[in-house]
Each structure stands twice: as C-alpha cells, then as structure tokens.
C-alpha cells in the first residue's frame, strides 16, 4: 500500500514522501496514529493544503524535544539491583525500568522512545539511547550496581566484576608463569602417582 507520510519516520522517509509499505503496517500503525494518509488524489491535495500547519507542528514538537534533550542529554542515573558475585543481575533492567527511573526524575518519556536491543543483565555503566523525536536522539548513562557505594566506585572507573573486586585477588598474580617453572623437567618419575 502506498501512503503519504505526515511526519518523518525513521527508516521509512521524510514528511510528504509517498512510500510503499506493507498493508498491515499501514492499517495497524501508520493510519490509526495519524502518521500517514493513503496515497490517493484526494489525500494528496488535502496534504498539500495542510502541509504548512503540519510542518509548523513538527517544528514545534522538535523544539520541545530539543529542550528536553538539552536537560536530559548526557545525564547519569544510578540503578540499584541485586546481583551475584560475578556481577550478573537477578533479573534485568529493561525499557520499562528506564522509563520509571526517568519519571522519578521528572521526565515524561514513553517506553517506545527507549531504544535498547536487549535488557541490561550485568552491573556496570551502560549507555541507553532515547529517541525524543524522529530527529532528536540522546544517550543517557545507567550506572547499574548492587548498592549506592558500588555505584560511586564504578563512577570513579573501578571494575567491580574483576577477580580483585570480587575475591580480593590480584589478577596479575594469577599468571601461568607464577604457577609453573619453565625450567622444570617434564619427565619426572613421581608424576605417575
């Protein structure tokens, strides 16, 4: 089905373009949400008549998104979750959790605006992309830790999943050279015991 886009849609096209999409995508998403019109002669003339107001509305939305981006962009948020010794979370931090964290800070972001390929399943510093508008995308940092103290240590650059952090063992002391004598003869008779 061919549709006329009423706003810029990422990976599809710019406002005013006539694009061919699958029927289900048009019927279930683009048309009901008012993001597109069916591409016929009547709708093309209607679009040209409303083009100026649509562009003004899009510009207004973009400027609002840019204001939020200026405040929110580059911020870091601490997420405290329970995790095992190796840093593996008992659960995960998903888009829903990111929305709740941002809402607690006073930002109104929808779950569909949070772009995460997979949920976060380990402690550490993680960058999360947020699409505020089709043309405005920012990145926030999530500091996932077991406690506020660990989050502070991670912020300073300490790795909490290393052997030293977990067991108090210096990883440099675990080199194979320290365990084996390269000069030793491998044909000792008491090896058969």
Swiss-Prot record:
PROSITE patterns listed in its UniProt record: RIBOSOMAL_L9
Region (Disordered): 174-193
GO cellular component, one term: ribosome
Keyword annotations from UniProtKB, A to Z: Ribonucleoprotein, Ribosomal protein, RNA-binding, rRNA-binding
Listed GO biological process terms: translation
Keyword Ribosomal protein among record annotations: yes
Transmembrane segments: none
Gene Ontology MF terms: rRNA binding; structural constituent of ribosome
Keyword Ribonucleoprotein: yes
Pfam families per UniProt: Ribosomal_L9_C, Ribosomal_L9_N
Family of the protein in this entry: Belongs to the bacterial ribosomal protein bL9 family.
Protein name as annotated: Large ribosomal subunit protein bL9
The organism of origin for this protein: Rhizobium rhizogenes (strain K84 / ATCC BAA-868) (Agrobacterium radiobacter)
Gene (UniProt): rplI
